[in-house]
Amino acid sequence: MIVFTALTRDINPPSNVERIDPKTLHLSGEFAEQNLGTTVGADGGVTVRVIATQFMFVPRCIAVPHGRRVTLRFATPDVIHGLLITGTNVNTMVVPGFVAQVHTEFTRTGDLLMPCHEYCGLGHSEMWATVQVVPESEFKPGQDGRVSCAQR
C-alpha cells in the first residue's frame, strides 16, 4: 500500500531530488573517491561531497569555512542513513538512489560532530565524522581547489 501511494501520489524523498545509481556512484562522477571532500569552485562556491556507507562517512573529516555559504551533498550505496551536524541546522536523510543536498552557513569555528542518526546496522554507533569549521583566513584551497583536514 505504501509503494502504491508513493507512486500514484508522486511522493518523493525530502531535499532536492536528484537520482543516482547507488551501485556505481563510487566509480565515476562527482562521488568518485578523488572527488569527495571539500572543493572550491571557480566562482568561490564551496561544495562538500560525502558518501555515507555502512558504517562510516567518507571522508571522515571535512573542512569548511566560517561565515560562507556551503553546499553539502550526500549519497549512499547501501542503506538509508540520517545525519546531523551538531550546533547547526543541518539534518537530512540519505536514501540509496538519491542525492541529498543541504545549504548552510557555519556561524562558529571549531570541530563539530556529524553522527549518523538512522539505525543502519550493528556498527551504527561508530558511524560519525568531524566537520572542522575554520576561520575564512585559514581556509586555503590548494591549486586543485580542494581543502582537507590534513592540510591544517
List the model feature ranges, each with a label.
Residues 67-69, 109-111:
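Extracellular Ig-like/FN3 beta-sandwich strand-entry sites
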Residues 85-109, 140-151:
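Extracytoplasmic beta-sandwich strand-turn segments characteristic of Greek-key/jelly-roll folds
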Residues 46-50, 58-60, 64, 73-98, ...:
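Histidine- and aromatic-enriched segments that form or immediately flank copper-ligand environments
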